[in-house]
Amino acid sequence: MPVAALIREEIEIPENVNVEINGSTVVVKSGAKELKRELMYPGIEISTEDGKVVIECAFPRKAQTAIVGTYRSHIQNMITGVTDGFEYKLVIRYAHFPMKVSAKGNTVMIDNFLGEKYTRTAKIMDGVTVKVSGEDVVVSGANKEFVGQTAANIEQATKVKGRDTRIFQDGIYIVEKAGKVL
């Protein structure tokens, strides 16, 4: 079975996006948005040529082949993040005790969950905004991983351990992530 001598992935850079590569650090800028990420793996080189980001690896092993594809996805997500951004939609569900959800600073506060007297909190990652309106929660930002982690933090804050989720359906649930309806 022949092995490829060179793996090369290319990513088109849109006109309004600037990509800088300093050693192993990739910086993607567009307007006021900027994302920076450290991408370093032995044998893999990242460069820019003719309006494209090029990821290359000579005589790759399985792990290096996988990492080249992973880096391509990371850079593509960075470009999408600074141009369009990412948005997760969550919905608040309750049967008897109405929840009060609010975002202040870098935390989301959930009051009166299942009639509890204390406030449950969820962390908001850097560069992410959370908007609560009625029974809808919208999490948005440029960094896909931070937006997803913030949405997961909010969902996990309302998990009830030891109860059947088919019966006890109170909570905050992700219904749409990065444009995909679940």
UniProtKB/Swiss-Prot annotation:
Q: Record the organism.
A: Methanococcus maripaludis (strain DSM 14266 / JCM 13030 / NBRC 101832 / S2 / LL)
Per UniProt, subunit arrangement is: Part of the 50S ribosomal subunit.
Task: Return the similarity comment.
Answer: Belongs to the universal ribosomal protein uL6 family.
Q: Does the keyword Ribosomal protein apply?
A: yes
Q: Provide the protein name.
A: Large ribosomal subunit protein uL6
Q: What Gene Ontology cellular component terms go with this record? A: cytosolic large ribosomal subunit
Q: Which Pfam families match?
A: Ribosomal_L6
GO BP terms, alphabetized: cytoplasmic translation
Keywords recorded for this protein, A-Z = Ribonucleoprotein, Ribosomal protein, RNA-binding, rRNA-binding
Entry's PANTHER family? Answer: 60S RIBOSOMAL PROTEIN L9, 60S/50S RIBOSOMAL PROTEIN L6/L9
